[in-house]
Amino acid sequence: MEIIKLALPKGSLEKATYKFFENAGYSIKGQTRTYRPIINDESISVKILRPQEIPKNIQEGTQDVGISGEDWVKENKADVVKLLNLDYGKVRIVVALPNSNKSRNFSSVLNNNIKNKKQLRISTEYLNLAKQYVMNNEIYKKKYGNKTPLIITPWFKTGTNKDVKIMFSFGATEAKPPEEADVIFDVIETGSTLAQNNLKVIDTIMESSAYLIANKKALKDPKKRQKIYDVLSLCKGVVEAKSKVHIFMNVKKNNINHVLGIIPSLESPTISELSKNGWYSVNTVIPREEFLQILPSLRKYAQGL
C-alpha cells in the first residue's frame, strides 16, 4: 500500500542515485524501461523525473519526497524542506568566458561593456541564479539600479534592461561563446569541458550536491512523516558510512584508560568483557580522518585492529 511518492532524478545524478539507494538497502528495478520503476518497499512509489522539475513538484505536492541538486532547489526558489545533503553529485555553478577575454571578474566584464556601449549577452540554464547574481553586482547596481536584465526564453520575455541580456540555454552552454554569448553561467564538475572549449572560470556562484528534500505538508501527515524519516534514516547511514569507520579492538584491562584517552571525546565506545581473563572488547564509530591519526597510538595499547 502506497504511503509516499518518491521522485528520483534522471540524467547526471541517475546512476549515482541508484547506487546510493542500493547502499541504503533498496532495490529498484525497471528504471531503464519505465519512468515508474519498482522498489522493494510497497509503501513507496517511485517516479523518475528531471532534477530541474523535482523541487517544484515536491513543493506542489505531486511528489512527497525526492532527490535533486541544491542548485535546482535554489533556481526554482522551491519552498521545500532540505532533509539531508547526500554528499554526491558535487558540482559548481560558475561564471565563465572565452580565454581571449582578459577580464578577471564579472565586474570587469560588465564595466567594459558599459564603456563600449555594448550589450552583454549571457547564456545559461539558471535564469534566476543568473539574474540574482547580475543584479547583486555593485557595478550593475550603480549603473542600472533595480532594473531587471532582459530575460529571453522560447516561452516568454521579461525585464527592462536591454544592456544586459540573459538567454535560456537548453544545454551545451559551453558551445555558445563567442558567437551567441559573451559570458555563460554553467554547471561544472572538473572544468575540463570548459577548458576544451577555450573558456575560463572567473567566479563561482555556488557549490551544489544532491539533496533529499520533502514536501512541507507531507511532513505534517503522521504516516507520511514516519515513512519519509525511515528513508532519511537509511540515507543518513549511507552518508555517515563514507565519513566514519566502525573500529573493534581487544584491550587489556590496565590499558583501557589509555585507549579511552585516545578515542575522540565525543564518541561513546561499547566495552564488554571477553572470556580471556583481563581482556575487554572495545568498539566505537569515529570519523575516518581521525582514525588514521590515532591508529599508531591505538596499536600501542590494543590488539585486533
Residue ranges and their predicted role:
Residues M1-S43, I48, I67-V81, N85-K90, ...:
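Small-molecule-sensing regulatory modules
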